[in-house]
């Protein structure tokens, strides 16, 4: 029995259309809260044994074909507000990264690194997303979240365990808002910089394809800068190329010809196709270089039940 809600609670909701790769089976339940109070009350009343999975806009996610045995929580319009207060940019977890970058720039605040990062602020914080040498951790002050027990809390950035493409958020914790510190900048110059970033991205990445962004993390321990905190200069795409996996296919899944660290759904791919191709890339790269790539895309859920 699910607790009463003011938002939307749907049983057996197929998740494929909520992910950028357009794959995935059903969640036991999908909850879209009306606001933070609705989220707090729901989690406080939900059986503690029921797993909870916070889901952003599905930009960095493979949901397996068997679906998710959990309550998936997806934030919407009640969580996408953006406001500027001095040098602080406060964004709801459902606000798109690109929208936050543009709003900040219009106000003369520099969060331009967010402009070409796919997805929403909640996911960007959870993954410590970064681009052009800048990461969420470089700007984040604090987050607001609701714990699995239904308590609203403020968590300083220092307590989030932010590292390369990861964080240490408590299990079942749902981010609702993030506060960033942003340096001042000229709005016209910031807009020009973002246009350059977009042009660079569109010329080198398959932005018109169904993808989830970078598939694998750049390997740790290989630095060309000498900085102790910048040890990911060996690029995953280069290792994939050297292993002969650019353009490799499995079913409807393909490693992009345009950028070999992008896994794309060419049409009709299953989650098994996508994940299977990714695992084959990991195997082939290890055979070629002795380096084991790590997934950057999150993979969740169950394999489909074999009915034979």
Swiss-Prot record:
Location of the region described as Disordered in the Swiss-Prot/TrEMBL record: 197-228
Q: Do the record's keywords include Chloroplast?
A: no
Biological process terms from the Gene Ontology for this record are: cell division; cell wall organization; peptidoglycan biosynthetic process; regulation of cell shape
Write one Gene Ontology MF term: FAD binding
EC number per UniProt: 1.3.1.98
What enzyme category does the UniProt record give?
oxidoreductase
- Biased composition regions of type Basic and acidic residues, renumbered to the chain: 197-211
| PROSITE patterns assigned | FAD_PCMH
Instruction: State the GO CC annotations.
Output: cytosol
Residues the record marks as active site = 165, 214 (proton donor), 296
Q: Which cofactor does it need?
A: FAD
Q: Where in the cell is it found?
A: Cytoplasm
Q: Keyword set for this entry?
A: Cell cycle, Cell division, Cell shape, Cell wall biogenesis/degradation, Cytoplasm, FAD, Flavoprotein, NADP, Oxidoreductase, Peptidoglycan synthesis
Biochemical pathway: Cell wall biogenesis; peptidoglycan biosynthesis
Compositional bias segments (type: Polar residues)? 212-226
Q: Which residues form the FAD-binding PCMH-type domain?
A: 22-185
| Cystine residue pairs | none
Q: Which Pfam families match?
A: FAD_binding_4, MurB_C
Catalysed reaction per UniProt?
Answer: UDP-N-acetyl-alpha-D-muramate + NADP(+) = UDP-N-acetyl-3-O-(1-carboxyvinyl)-alpha-D-glucosamine + NADPH + H(+)
Q: Which family does it belong to?
A: Belongs to the MurB family.
Role summary: Cell wall formation.
**What is the protein name for this chain?**
UDP-N-acetylenolpyruvoylglucosamine reductase
Look up and give the organism this protein is from.
Cereibacter sphaeroides (strain KD131 / KCTC 12085) (Rhodobacter sphaeroides)
The top of its lineage is: Bacteria, Pseudomonadati, Pseudomonadota, Alphaproteobacteria, Rhodobacterales
């Amino acid at each position: 029995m699910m607790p009463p809600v003011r938002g939307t609670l749907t049983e057996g909701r197929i998740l494929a259309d909520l992910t950028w790769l357009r794959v995935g089976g059903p969640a036991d339940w999908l909850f879209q809260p009306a606001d933070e109070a609705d989220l707090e009350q729901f989690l406080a009343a939900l059986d503690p044994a029921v797993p909870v999975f916070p889901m952003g806009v599905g930009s960095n996610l493979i949901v397996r074909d068997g679906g998710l045995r959990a309550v998936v929580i997806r934030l919407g319009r009640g969580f996408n507000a953006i406001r500027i207060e001095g040098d602080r940019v406060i964004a709801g977890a459902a606000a798109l990264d690109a929208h936050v970058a543009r709003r900040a720039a219009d106000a003369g605040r520099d969060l331009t690194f967010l402009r070409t990062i796919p997805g929403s602020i909640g996911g960007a914080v959870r993954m410590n997303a970064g681009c052009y040498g800048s990461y969420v951790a470089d700007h984040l002050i604090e987050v607001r979240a609701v714990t699995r027990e239904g308590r609203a809390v403020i968590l300083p950035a220092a307590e989030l365990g932010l590292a390369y493409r990861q964080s240490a958020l408590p299990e079942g914790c749902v981010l609702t808002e993030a506060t960033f510190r942003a340096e001042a900048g000229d709005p016209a110059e910031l807009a020009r910089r973002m246009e350059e970033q977009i042009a660079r991205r569109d010329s080198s990445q398959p932005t018109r394809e169904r993808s989830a962004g970078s598939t694998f993390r750049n390997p740790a321990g290989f630095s060309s800068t000498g900085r102790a905190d910048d040890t990911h200069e060996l690029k995953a795409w280069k290792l994939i190329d050297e292993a002969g996996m650019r353009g490799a296919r499995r079913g409807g899944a393909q490693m992009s010809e345009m950028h070999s660290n992008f896994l794309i759904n060419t049409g009709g791919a299953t989650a098994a196709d996508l994940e299977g191709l990714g695992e084959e890339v990991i195997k082939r790269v290890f055979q070629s270089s002795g380096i084991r790539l790590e997934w950057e895309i999150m993979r969740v859920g169950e394999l489909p039940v074999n009915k034979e």
